[in-house]
């Protein structure tokens, strides 16, 4: 699959080589008791991503999605999915490459991770859970702002 990324160069390449689950975990520590409680959980979603160069112009990007559902102080379930992809990327300057690996690649991986979370929650016999779409562009900008603010505190 090819994508066109914003660049002044005609030599930009972006290809998805593979998308796969790197790690998956589902825990429901308070079953079966949690099934007897009125289902009105507090859902917390944590996201992070990491990218590493694995070969010339080839990167592995791993998106980690952790979902915790709590009813009062009891954990109903905890689901963690590490959705990974191998991307062939070239022709970008350093700034464009960072944005590609921190925004574009996680955006591609998120629907796969979300579906995996939903499947695991359903297999745990909990009500359907559909994660809201994530704007990785905003998360990236916020992380840059935080790094900038942290450097000002020194």
From Swiss-Prot:
GO CC aspect terms: cytoplasm
Gene3D superfamilies (alphabetical): SecB-like
Family annotation (NCBIfam families): PRK05751.1-4 (NF004393), secB (TIGR00809)
Described function: One of the proteins required for the normal export of preproteins out of the cell cytoplasm. It is a molecular chaperone that binds to a subset of precursor proteins, maintaining them in a translocation-competent state. It also specifically binds to its receptor SecA.
Entry superkingdom: Bacteria
Chief localisation class: cytoplasm
Keywords: Chaperone, Cytoplasm, Protein transport, Translocation, Transport
Record localization: Cytoplasm
Molecular function terms from GO: unfolded protein binding
Pfam families: SecB
Family that this chain belongs to: Belongs to the SecB family.
GO biological process, one term: protein folding
Keyword Cytoplasm: yes
Designated name of the protein: Protein-export protein SecB
Record note on quaternary structure: Homotetramer, a dimer of dimers. One homotetramer interacts with 1 SecA dimer.
């Amino acid at each position: 699959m090819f994508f066109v990324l914003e660049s002044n160069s005609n030599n930009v390449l972006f290809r998805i080589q593979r998308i796969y689950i790197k790690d998956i975990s589902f825990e429901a520590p308070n079953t079966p008791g949690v099934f007897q409680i009125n289902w009105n959980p507090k859902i917390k979603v944590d996201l992070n991503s990491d990218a590493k160069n694995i070969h010339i112009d080839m990167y592995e990007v791993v998106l980690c999605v952790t979902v915790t559902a709590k009813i009062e102080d009891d954990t109903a379930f905890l689901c963690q999915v590490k959705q990974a992809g191998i991307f062939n990327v070239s022709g970008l300057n350093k700034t464009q490459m960072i944005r590609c690996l921190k925004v574009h690649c996680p955006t591609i991986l998120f629907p796969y991770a979300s579906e995996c979370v939903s499947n695991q929650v359903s297999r745990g016999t909990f009500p359907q859970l559909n994660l809201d779409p994530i704007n990785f562009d905003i998360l990236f900008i916020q992380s840059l702002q935080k790094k900038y603010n942290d450097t000002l505190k020194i």
